[in-house]
């Protein structure tokens, strides 16, 4: 086996306490996640992870939905603990009986251990069965008074790697207004007021990623002023988006055709933000004109 470490979080706890929100939060933090994992399959799954170069941060939901399989949880945890290449923690989500009953009434779902349909009986049985696991958990979170957003923030605070990159990803994209606004954009900026390289014959067939086009776009005084204001607007508000629990922020910059000005600006912005944040850069329409010409 590889000597590289796996960072494993076992997510467990009371049914209705927020495990679905929790596992989604781990996925947003960049973890490889699996919901409702039978305990007996965990060691074999971790062996497969060790043999690959895939994501070594893993979060698995293991709970009473496994029913009969759950009795193997102790032997599974012993196996994990004996493996020096695995660092693991247990996150236990809890809530008061009254709050859990209220949540089940609201969703109209049945409790996995309520054989006769009485939710409170199922909750009490589950609490008794999970008591030993709760006592060995490194993290116990009471979600009784927490909103989903607050739970996501709690998980981010406790399990992110301590950087902005772990909890907010920024998608910087360019586009052409003539092809429509991006439906998933959170912030949209229009750079059609800038001089257009399209009217420079030697630049027309190139894109904003080509050095001469990039320099043409960014060297104009209007570009310098606008870019400065753009950074001054975006950078201070990123922590606020992060605090609100947003995992992906899409910043879209548009020009007429999405080939020159918006591409150059998006590329420049992505490089600036990437010094402190996790950034993905994309250019939706930069080749759209060429593809249209080739099809005609």
Curated annotation (Swiss-Prot):
The keyword ATP-binding applies. SUPFAM superfamilies: P-loop containing nucleoside triphosphate hydrolases. HAMAP family: RapZ_like (MF_00636). Keywords: ATP-binding, GTP-binding, Nucleotide-binding. PANTHER family: RNASE ADAPTER PROTEIN RAPZ. ATP binds at residues 13-20. The keyword Nucleotide-binding applies. InterPro entries: P-loop_NTPase (IPR027417), RapZ-like (IPR005337), RapZ-like_N (IPR053930), RapZ_C (IPR053931). Displays ATPase and GTPase activities. This is Nucleotide-binding protein M6_Spy0559.
